[in-house]
């Protein structure tokens, strides 16, 4: 249901079914806000509209979604209208009584076993009718007045359209309301629809509770095996719970009356002063929590586990009704609009320097800390590395900044897991190892050996290839740093580099340790008793290989230090880097190539296992790949000619190769080297080509899934389609007021003028298509008509936009055609014209390019008209490191993305007004997504919505863009 701004100003409530209790007068805003209503609601005593309507002060006013005020007619309660014999019965009341009497007769006639099965099924039917049926219908009514529009379209309330049903409805009103029915004709259709709806609710509710009661009675047990004392206690508690449940229901109805009991706020708003006491002071959501405690009272009385299980299921379904329908409905009708991000700065006048240059901030101009030499918050001056325009310092810290500095998508239980963060990586690792004993304790020796083998191989593959590819992409395109820049907000660029390197160090060290530990466990698990004659030699060689490996690793660390050992030169540019051929590197260029796997072969010799030997060979080959394809290219890229070609050992071997007895083998060796180099090149090329193909495959898969969710192609044949006069159809984008041509900036609303035959389908729609997508999926011809064979990816509008709910055409509102703008009818040419506006989520924010509009027939993909192709573009700065240019382009994107939603009240917007003009208030996730996509289109910097929300300031976002471009420009 669409609530008007005036209604929102008078009403503030939140989640709950048929209960509305008071908000705190100080408006301290409890986050739960369930089943609450403002204490000081507008009463007719103080409402001038009531006096203008000439009503009595005691009468209650109602307001329809379109703003119409009316006097709410008193209605009889359910017990009075249905069960009092002296009251006339409406047709639906008679149906209710017949169904209830039928249940009584069946309970008396059916054998006990059959009664148990029947009433279990019968209760499930009515419970589904309640939770699923009413939930679905009420959701549609809450969102789009579906019930009201159905009654209006069917003519049940119009004597001219449907006289028979109109007479039946009037008879129902007269019987149900008695003398008050004389005023029903003056009541709005929303109120009349509610009166009919509550009669249907009575049928469902009474049959639901009666079926449950008979199901419980059919399962009642006697004393059983527990004795008289427990039986008496069980019955006393059960009766007490039933009595308490009855009080909850009666007291709740006393407070909220029939209006909230029958979800009247789905139809209209009732303006009256309510005092929420009694049961509403006992528990939250009383109609959902303690309001169903009678289920457990009957379970105690019957002593049946079947009744208990059915009661739990029924109560759970009612809670789902609360979560899926009632809470969203209350948010729509009563919920205060709260932004997802609001950066509100408060400053003293003395803190505000004179405005200079572009009016983007009230702070003095400073130079950005893009080089990362000093913190952006220390207020010092520095010169930009690129010599660009001066950049204002970030605004002062406020609650928004403090929150996003302390909490950055931190992992809570298992939410927001990011395996690039070492803490999350270790958490997942701990969970896996904590759960593994559940499997291992039931495994035999062979299974344990298999597990140890898989365990060792998995760690080796992860260490060499998983971390290897990550390091390779980090070297080529700063992949790891880009991940942190994309997902987290940083005060300066060096903070992003430092944090990414910090997490890398922990993950790499953990992986390195686990690689050796997992292989050692495999060697122990696969150990076999030595029975050959050379076991002493194997023992000595194995220990020597392990000691050689330890000496080699220790010697390498002494030369490399922690920076080189942990591959710091892949991350940190400012750290002094130089090649030092001392220590073990005096003799070997890369000791790991020859001795990096010695420990694995040593442990394999000690175990005497073929399995361990094979895994050791795999480890050695994997590490060779890492050194050749990851570390080697990076060293050549970073140090160039400083990389030594020949080590001391290599020089001596080369001299040995000059001897005559080895010259004969030289051609074969050179040929083998050439083959290995070519094979390495082929593997490297394959890896480079596979990555973009996998990315395209993922994009195509996402596009296909989205296409399935859109319009299904409906292939009509016959004269009804072929005889359409396409000359009467036209669709044209109106030129942009900024460029004065059909050329639109990303995010700029596109006004579309369309023309159609007067008798065209109300299900016609207009799609916005990228030309490259149309070229990739050529159109299909069906007679004289084109059929679009690609998806609009959600970029479409119905010509009668208000008649659509998602992708489903409701087709009930007979309003003038057109959505935004005025439609007109040309009686001479028998054509109708209108205006539609593509804006917000209907625009391609992340994909500027050449586009085309297509007018489609009757909810199909038949093309009746096409527009001329036009351009959607995004400005880009001439100097990619200019603050002023970036700021101006970003401001344009923000202006389009932050167009205030229709439901945003001026009072809510004023509450989050900031002293800093650069501060942003984001109301929806869509706005953050549009800003993110616009930044990608204009600057080719990839952020997530979380970064946009964390910044919430034009100056900070500009800094983030410049920082990311500089860090990733390498």
From Swiss-Prot:
PROSITE patterns: SAM_CHO2 (PS51598). Its EC number is 2.1.1.17. One of its GO terms (biological process) is methylation. It is a multi-pass membrane protein. GO terms for molecular function: phosphatidylethanolamine N-methyltransferase activity. Pathway: Phospholipid metabolism; phosphatidylcholine biosynthesis. Residues 111-116, 221-227, 303-304, 446, 525-533, 616-970 are cytoplasmic. Residues 24-59 are annotated as: Disordered. It is found in: Endoplasmic reticulum membrane. GO terms for cellular component: endoplasmic reticulum membrane. Pfam families: PEMT. Residues 1-89, 138-199, 249-281, 326-424, 468-503, 554-594 are lumenal. It catalyses: a 1,2-diacyl-sn-glycero-3-phosphoethanolamine + S-adenosyl-L-methionine = a 1,2-diacyl-sn-glycero-3-phospho-N-methylethanolamine + S-adenosyl-L-homocysteine + H(+). Residues 24-48 have a biased composition (Basic and acidic residues). It is an enzyme of class 2 (transferase). HAMAP family: PEMT. Belongs to the class VI-like SAM-binding methyltransferase superfamily. CHO2 family. Catalyzes the first step of the methylation pathway of phosphatidylcholine biosynthesis, the SAM-dependent methylation of phosphatidylethanolamine (PE) to phosphatidylmonomethylethanolamine (PMME). This is Phosphatidylethanolamine N-methyltransferase. It comes from Malassezia globosa (strain ATCC MYA-4612 / CBS 7966) (Dandruff-associated fungus).
